């Protein structure tokens, strides 16, 4: 059987928004300056990388980044890349009320419409953290796919709503929490699985307030780990989705750009590989796996 391996770069432009919403740098001019590097220096470097190898990419952009870096946003759109939603200030969905989460989502959609001329079809939850109603909000507002959940790794699937589970409460009797997870109802929302082991940020970005922050792991080690994953996928699977999550904060650094060049060149040696946007992955999955009505 011929191989069909869809490969994609998802670029999360956390930039200043990441420090405001997730990384604990909201009071640090130095950390904010690192966010400015991501937007002003990092984005053009990644665009140059993609242009060199003729690759499409999907950029998941917080609203804050859209409004803070208008020149760089125009460069992304002019290059023909896809733009998806990624919060406004990289807010944690779990920490917000339902109204706050919906307001942020609607603002993100509005800004992307103004930027690209069309509504986004895809969403990435900041910090890959879903609230109990994120699924429902995405469905309500017409999103086609999400890239935040991890039920699978290299195969898309339809998102469920209504999963429930019992948390442990040691003030109760054990029988009160000893219950299995209950699966909810499948929806039309396509999940393109997220994968912490194909994300550049945790191992290669130093964050002062994060207790498990690294930032100094060699890109040679990370690049080999990503290549090893691709090699296994290519050996074991005829159809698969291999999506890599990167950030201009990290992957625009010289040592990491060289890592990506090696990864791209390795992947390109294989037959049956196709570089695509996330929207193309979702459309391909929908054709392969139409839902039964």
UniProtKB/Swiss-Prot annotation:
Q: Which residues form the NodB homology domain?
A: 29-276
Q: Which UniProt keywords apply?
A: Carbohydrate metabolism, Cell wall biogenesis/degradation, Hydrolase, Metal-binding, Polysaccharide degradation, Xylan degradation, Zinc
Identify one Pfam family in the record: Polysacc_deac_1
One GO biological-process annotation of the entry reads: cell wall organization
| PROSITE patterns (alphabetical) | NODB
Source species, domain of life: Bacteria
* Top-rank EC class of the record's enzyme: hydrolase
- Its Enzyme Commission number(s) read 3.5.1.-, 3.1.1.72
Binding annotation for Zn(2+): 14, 86, 90
- Molecular function per GO: acetylxylan esterase activity; hydrolase activity, acting on carbon-nitrogen (but not peptide) bonds; metal ion binding
Reactions it catalyzes: Deacetylation of xylans and xylo-oligosaccharides
Quaternary arrangement and interactors, per the entry?
Answer: Homotetramer.
Described function: Catalyzes the N-deacetylation of peptidoglycan (PG), an important mechanism that appears to confer lysozyme resistance and to mitigate host immune detection; this likely contributes to pathogen persistence in the host. The exact nature of the residue in PG that is deacetylated has not been determined. Is also able to catalyze the deacetylation of acetylated xylan, and, to a lesser extent, that of chitin and chitosan. Therefore, this enzyme might play a role during infection, considering that xylan-containing carbohydrate structures are among those commonly consumed by humans.
Query: Know the name of this protein?
Result: Peptidoglycan deacetylase
